[in-house]
Regions:
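Mobile active-site "lid"/loop adjacent to the S-adenosyl-L-methionine
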Residues: 102, 115-157, 161, 166-171
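Class I S-adenosyl-L-methionine
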Residues: 10, 166-211
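Conserved class I S-adenosyl-L-methionine
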Residues: 53-63
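S-adenosyl-L-methionine
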Residues: 84-129
Length: 211
């Protein structure tokens, strides 16, 4: 496919061409998902089937909503889904959405009302600059913040899944995860672009370390 818009830079033109020709972009359109990211969560749920037993779920960085759609289609029993994003998200049946930052009082109020959660998900991506050190710090900060939320609001036995980027050392964060969860691993779905450094941290069965 040729991209003829002359106002686009070569870089933008290449990105657009790759996007419209992407297998998962086409598939998401055909299967009525809001974005290709849906297939990443499908693969995660398939590999880590215990996640499908979740009933009270938090989706951080939820917009445009494809992960909520996957949860609705793959978890068939009664459930509650709280979706959180700074970006607006069109309504999804069965999903409660709050348009705020997870440091806002509105989020804290909702989370405290609905806790404990048995699954907390994050597909948040930082605004990458192309500078490795800066991008690592941004990615690391997001991972630290989402892990803090998981440790605060997950029930014992609950699970945490978060995107991060392999741009630097996070061994201290992994140590915290291993201290607080029975099983900790990393997983890169086949639907994640090969050239992307993104990968997902999978933390299963939060420990009752206070007992």
């Amino acid at each position: 496919m040729k991209i003829k818009n002359k106002s686009l830079s070569d870089k933008s033109r290449k990105w657009l061409k790759r996007h419209v020709e992407d297998e998962y972009v086409k598939k998401s359109s055909k299967e009525n998902y809001r974005s290709r990211a849906a297939y990443k969560l499908m693969e995660i749920l398939q590999k880590y089937s215990a996640l499908k037993n979740s009933r009270v779920i938090m989706d951080l960085g939820s917009a445009p909503g494809s992960w909520c759609e996957v949860l609705n289609r793959n978890i068939h029993t009664e459930k509650y889904i709280l979706a959180v994003d700074l970006l607006k998200m069109k309504p999804i049946k069965g999903v409660e959405f709050i348009n705020c930052d997870f440091n806002d009082d509105q989020f804290i109020e909702f989370a405290n009302q609905k806790k404990p959660f048995d699954l907390i998900l994050s597909d948040i991506s930082p605004n990458l600059s192309g500078y490795k050190n800066a991008d690592h710090l941004r990615s690391r900060e997001i991972l630290e913040n989402t892990l803090d939320i998981a440790l605060k609001y997950l029930e014992n036995g609950g699970h945490f899944v978060s995107k991060y980027f392999r741009t630097g050392d996070i061994s201290d964060i992994l140590s915290t995860c291993k201290k607080n969860f029975d099983k900790v691993s990393s997983f890169k779905p086949t639907s994640s672009r090969k050239e992307s450094s993104e990968i997902y941290l999978i933390c299963l069965n939060k420990k009752n370390i206070d007992s």
